[in-house]
Structure formats: C-alpha cells, structure tokens
Curated annotation (Swiss-Prot):
This is Probable transcription factor KAN4. SUPFAM superfamilies: Homeodomain-like (SSF46689). Residues 185-194 have a biased composition (Acidic residues). Residues 102-162 form the HTH myb-type domain. Residues 30-52, 161-220 are annotated as: Disordered. Plants overexpressing KAN4 show reduced or absent ovule outer integument and color alteration of the seed coat. The keyword Nucleus applies. GO terms for cellular component: nucleus. It is found in: Nucleus.
Length: 276
C-alpha cells in the first residue's frame, strides 16, 4: 500500500507543473550560519562594509587633482577661436567686396548743365591735367554721382582736350564734345534694358568706338580749317607789307631855276638826282 501511494504521488507530481517563481533575496553571508557567538564577525563585516561605503563616498566628494593638461588645452582652444572668427570675418568681407564689385553702377546722364558744372570744377582745380576724379567729385557735390562716373568723364574730357590743344576753334570743339556726350547718353538710354554680358555688348562697344573716332575726326577737321585760315590771313598780311614797302615817297628835287626843267622837257642822263 505504501508503495502504491508513493507511486501515485510521484505520478501526480510529474503530471502537474511547478509554477512557483522561487524568488529569493540575495544573501551575502549565505555560507556563514548565524549563531550567537558569531555576532562580532557580523558586526565587523558590517563595519568594514560601512567603512568601505564611507571611503567611497569621501572619494567621490573629494576634489580630483589633475596635472592641468586639460585646462591648458581648453585655454589654447579659446585662444584659437578669435582667429577663426577673424578669418571668417575676412572671408565674409571679401565676399561682400566681390558682390559690390559685381553690382553694376547706375547710369548717369551728363546733361549740358552738369557738363558745364564739371568744366567749372576742373578749371577751379587748375585744368584737366592737374584735376583728379576725387577732387572733382568733392568739388561738384552732386547727388548720385559716383567716382567711376567722374573718372570716365574726366578721361574723355582729357582726350578731347589733348587732341585739340592750342587750336583756335576750342569753343566749337567743346560744343561738338557736348553734342557727342548727349548722343552717347541717348545710346546708353536706348541700351539700358540690355545686360552687359549679352552679345549686344560688343555692338554697343563698337558704336561707342565709332562715336569716339568721329569726334576725333571732327576735331581734327576743325583744327585743320583753323590752321588753314590762319595761313591765309598771314599770307595776305605779308603781301600787304610788301606793297607798303614798294611804295616810296617822291623826294626828288633839282638845283637851278624852276623854269629850267620846263625848257628842257626831255630828261638827260647827266642830271644828278638827290634822293633822301
């Protein structure tokens, strides 16, 4: 009977699974039985563990000592940062300068009054040879007038003056130059919508060169006409002076009676004439 009961219990235990979790708390002193005489060992162990914990806490609370390499490296990185910022600033400033150079200057119409003001400023500065674009710009003091405008106009004015230097038709040349300037302004207004990088820019440059060549030809023709006029006037003056020198006063007189010349109508070669 006992054998049968034990077999039945074994079968029942094998058929029903064990669903217990078997959770146990960690026991650091499992191998050591707790007896009355071993309290000193447990107290010493607990004291040693507490001392270890306090030592660890003090270790974490105490400030760490270092040799200073990290701090020195941090200072060096801080020292290099302004240089990097300076380089970035230089790069940004250079990019801004490039953008300003790429931006096209607005067109300026040189009217007759503005050109007269320009000529007056150049004359006050001592002529076109001594005047500089910056000084002319400061003396004119015109709104929306840039240094590039004054520089190009002064260069054109110098070329016209140098080609027609010393010619008597200087006023005519200035009028022709003003007319050419107005024609160039009209051409620029007509081509204002086109871009400088377009293929039409070459044709515009050709027309400007043709206008410059035509102004030079006109100035040369005016100067040649003036010189020819001077040559004719000088030639007529020389002829008049020659005619004046050929005319002499008749200061001839004879010695003797006044009726002697009437008696002898035919002049003889032996008569002596005194000329003064």
């Amino acid at each position: 009977m006992m054998m049968l009961e034990s077999r039945n219990s074994m079968r029942a235990s094998n058929s029903v699974p064990d669903l217990s979790l078997q959770i146990s708390l960690p026991n650091y002193h499992a191998g050591k039985p707790l007896h009355g005489g071993d309290r000193s060992s447990t107290s010493s162990d607990s004291g040693s563990s507490l001392s270890d914990l306090s030592h660890e806490n003090n270790f974490f609370n105490k400030p760490l000592l270092s040799l200073g390499f990290d701090h020195h490296h941090q200072r060096r990185s801080n020292m290099f940062q302004p240089q990097i910022y300076g380089r970035d600033f230089k790069r940004s400033s250079s990019s801004m300068v490039g953008l300003k150079r790429s931006i096209r200057a607005p067109r300026m119409r040189w009217t007759s009054t503005l050109h007269a003001h320009f000529v007056h400023a150049v004359q006050l500065l001592g002529g076109h040879e001594r005047a500089t674009p910056k000084s002319v710009l400061e003396l004119m003091n015109v709104k929306d007038l840039t240094l590039a405008h004054v520089k190009s106009h002064l260069q054109m004015y110098r070329t016209v003056k140098c080609t027609d230097k010393g010619s008597p038709g200087e006023g005519k040349v200035e009028k022709e130059a003003e007319q050419r300037i107005e024609d160039n302004n009209n051409n620029e207004e007509a081509d204002e919508g086109t871009d400088t990088n377009s293929p039409n820019s070459s044709s515009v440059q050709k027309t400007q060169r043709a206008s410059w060549s035509s102004t030079k030809e006109v100035s040369r023709s005016i100067s040649t006409q003036a010189y020819s006029h001077l040559g004719t006037t000088h030639h007529t003056k020389d002829n008049e002076e020659k005619e004046d020198t050929n005319i002499h006063l008749n200061l001839d007189f004879t010695l003797g009676r006044p009726s002697w010349g009437m008696e002898y109508a035919e002049p003889s070669s032996d008569l002596t004439l005194l000329k003064c």
